[in-house]
Amino acid sequence: MRSSQKSPVRRDSFLDVVRAVAIVAVVGQHWIMPVLGYQDAHLATGNALATPGWWVVTWLSQVMPLVFFAGGAANLLSLRRAPTARDWLGGRVQRLLLPVLPLMAVWLAVPPLLRGFGVPEQPVEVAGTIAAQLLWFLAVYLPTVLLTPLLAEAHRRWGLAVPVVLTGAAVLVDIARFSDIPLVGYANALFVWLAVHQLGFHYAEGRLGRLGRGAAVGVAAAGFGSTALLVAFGPYPASMIGMPGAPVSNMSPPTALLVSLAVGQVGLLLAVRPALNRLATTPVAGAALRWLGPRFMSIYLWHMPALVCVAGVAVLGLGYATPEPGTLRWLAMIPLWVAAAAAVLGRLLRLFGRFESMPLSSSARPAPVWRSACAGLLGATGLLGLAAGGFSTPEGGTLADSPVPWVALVLAAFLLARRVEAEQTGGRVVQHGTEERPAEPVVGRPAGDRSQLPGVGVRDVREVGAQHHPVGDPRQ
């Protein structure tokens, strides 16, 4: 399957800003919302957004719909520029898995070390869970990437009907889920996010970008209005994130409500798109976008371990307890808490951020499609196991109860996705283990190009160096 090739690369500032807004919102929410206390060897955890009336904040702070929207746009654009779907898939799968390897290596060692220093078992389990829980995104995004070439063809043929059908499937799943078949709800981990990902295709083609401000405001009103009606008269909770003790969550598993939320959020951002594009051209914002560009995936993966470090020292070591959310003391502590977490994250990025921009071999070709597909599915399975079980082995557990089997799956997936070593001879490429094929140039990319996808895009190496994003290649 050969992807169509496009004209020269140009930046889409809107997608850059959407990605930046998303990662800042994710990190800010995860750092600010925990309510922590420690007593009698037990770490108590709560959520500030569980405060009555604060659910409305989650309608804007739950930005995973924006991550999948931006990923859809970036994936379609980069797929069309790739020489073949094989080239595109091989690079994407390998690039998504590579930054996870150091996280797994570190967190296989951290729980035993904490126990060795005398940290009680329950806080160790909480730390291992928190460090791994966000891997759910990659467990869903990998299959999304694998399906992108097929979804791109479906988009070419049927256009808007594709996200409509996916949304309809999500609604049917919700009906079954709320009719005492709860496990079927996990099918929406694909239907919901694929529907939102597909909306990004329509932005990439220019349809959504051509909307005027009035039309975009109408889209936002329709999305948020539908969300409000479904919350008021349907089975859905008002909060767009999971709350401790809540019987139903809109996120685990995702509900069809997130599609209407995505429509509202995308419409809102499209309404201010000209202002966002102007903002991106200012020196400060431009510098921030360039700094964030090659670090999106690393920030996503390591911001929760940074929180674990700060909480371990402050809460377990110094006896700090989160003030009551909404009070002046709570507000006063936020800058100090965020600054401490940011300092730790900065150090972690210096240590492990290099894996996100590590170049792929320029003397080898991408793995065959079947290998990339198997690698993606294996990797998604391993990441899902880690997200569900965490990095800590239960007390008295066996090897089968530990994270080791899931880590092994992810490592095997990465090795399977590695590029096929090749020997260049007289314009022919001999691939070890595959058929002989003519060498093909990578159109629009210099030799040794390191561009990748993670939520998550890549900057043109000719513009700002090898910039890497967790939600696809934003180049247009």
Give the predicted meaning of each segment.
Residues 1-2, 449:
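Intrinsically disordered, low-complexity segments
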Residues 2-428:
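Alpha-helical transmembrane segments and their immediate juxtamembrane cytosolic regions
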Residues 26, 299, 427-428, 448, ...:
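A composition/secondary-structure signal for short, hydrophobic, low-basic-content segments
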Residues 303, 445-446:
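N-terminal leader/targeting segments
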Residues 424-425, 437-438, 451-459, 466:
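Compositionally biased, low-complexity intrinsically disordered regions
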Residues 429-430, 442-443, 456-464, 471:
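Hydrophobic alpha-helical signal/anchor motif
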Residues 431-439, 448-449, 455, 473:
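Residues flanking N-terminal targeting/processing segments that define the start of mature chains
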